[in-house]
Amino acid sequence: MKISFPAVPVTNCDERPAGELPSLVVVHAISLPPDRFGGPGVEQLFTNRLDPAGHAYYATIHHLRVSAHYFIRRGGELVCFVPPERRAWHAGVSSWRGRERCNDFSIGVELEGCDSLPFEGAQYETLAALLAELCDRFPVEGVAGHSDIAPGRKTDPGPFFSWSRLRRILLKAGRADVAARVEPDEVGQGGDPDRRRWPFPLGSRPL
């Protein structure tokens, strides 16, 4: 799998707790500026170079110190910001299966997208391939959305992300073992647009 890396090293990360291996993959969505794609904003945010004068929204977030392990652009290109062995700062206040501090034991994957538009086929293909690789390398038990580990606080990856499509790609690739770890239920968690029943207000929540 072809992976690119940011021009500037990411410092918004640290070490996981001793002996901790990632057991969860969290799927996010991000667009900077909101609902616009293809620009340098995401890399600038993760490398602490976001210009607050570059966009009105940037003035509200440029101070944040956040990151993710991976970023999948609209065309399917994969960028690695933080090695999966290290702890990226992507989950915030969160809980999964009764355990808090999901950053400690999760891998964060940001898709370039928003709550109001479908994701691209190339993004699903790259995500499926990445999940298969991560499940081969680490004891991953589940794949969940940011909204699943921070319900009511986060909405991403949003109602236009199709968990069933991701599962189908994994099954077609012969990775039923990985598909079985994709947790969210389409009904009540967003998913396919024709089935969405979103449990909290929508909005462009890129972080």
Where are these regions (language model features)?
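Active-site-adjacent loop/helix surface patches within enzyme catalytic domains
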Residues: 1-18, 24, 29-141
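Basic/polar, cationic surfaces and motifs that engage anionic cell-wall
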Residues: 1-3, 18, 100, 105, ...
